[in-house]
């Protein structure tokens, strides 16, 4: 029997030393699943609410005992006897129990941990892998692909304590024949970059997502360092490796002055000027993807950006869309961006996450599955990427176990699926 008999919540630690929520879901047949909710640093204002205790005497107010309490009491009671194979029903029970638009009563962290743990328990009950169960839930049974990784090898912005304003500088191993080879190429470039930075007298300390966090003179200097590292590793930029940016522009947007302020290099831009600044970078370097190139509320600016670059460059909405179908639909209807970043804790349940993926794909948008800067050893996003054939994944650099755990899971999945899960490289990127 795949009915839920026990739900357990607990407070565990994330990769930044902050508490987060973990849940176990047990079924009548002995099957069970465990999942943990991640946590972001640069968060969109429209994200579902991450419930924190606010008790300054404990974990600086970041405890999650309230959310854990909801799991162990209200949620556990409501889900007792529910069929774990009916994911949408399980999730809807929790959404109804919460009763708010942004999950502010129970917390998206509580609901998500239970939602994902339920999916894992159901997969075990069916005696299938998690990615296989996710493909079934997605309405695409047996359809898989290995994602093109977007590897964040230089961290800036809110993910690092340095002078670089753009948050992520990523490499994409488009020349690889399979995921295993892509991972190797990324690792070799990561180590090559360490040597380049050291030779120039820069720190090789890493940021939240495992990439280096040097103090560089400009954002362009980060791209220049990566260019040298790629060549030194024996690869050709533009042929073997392409580049991607996550600007996280909301973090350096001055709302009062209505300007984009790159403090690290002392430059200020209007919305239109910043679009041209980004376009100029794409003409100097093989940048094929730009995420959150403007503030999340700058819809006019995004419309201009999409007209300017949308036919050639993948323009990814993260803070812009926050994995929310209502907001995504507005973007689709108004010609804003052409790709969505998927972070399931932005919306708070697996069912709603799958709905966002479907809406994006149906509209011709590409999909990038993503981690958060505060992560755990939970590798569910690897299975999500393969099980939905999303095509792309962002899960950090080639260091820190919380990042590498996802890559290692993808290696295992590729070993299991072989030719059933093709690695399509650059074909997955919008505009390429």
UniProtKB/Swiss-Prot annotation:
(2R)-2-phosphoglycerate binds at residues 167, 343, 372-373, 394. Its EC number is 4.2.1.11. PANTHER family: ENOLASE. It is an enzyme of class 4 (lyase). Catalyzes the reversible conversion of 2-phosphoglycerate (2-PG) into phosphoenolpyruvate (PEP). It is essential for the degradation of carbohydrates via glycolysis. Its main location: cytoplasm. One of its GO terms (molecular function) is phosphopyruvate hydratase activity. Belongs to the enolase family. Binds a second Mg(2+) ion via substrate during catalysis. Pfam families: Enolase_C, Enolase_N. Mg(2+) binds at residues 246, 291, 318. GO terms for biological process: glycolytic process. Its cofactor is Mg(2+). Pathway: Carbohydrate degradation; glycolysis; pyruvate from D-glyceraldehyde 3-phosphate: step 4/5. It comes from the Bacteria. The active site is at 209 (proton donor), 343 (proton acceptor). Signal peptide: none annotated. It catalyses: (2R)-2-phosphoglycerate = phosphoenolpyruvate + H2O. Component of the RNA degradosome, a multiprotein complex involved in RNA processing and mRNA degradation. It is found in: Cytoplasm; Secreted; Cell surface. Gene3D superfamilies: Enolase-like C-terminal domain, Enolase-like, N-terminal domain. This is Enolase. GO terms for cellular component: cell surface; extracellular region; phosphopyruvate hydratase complex.
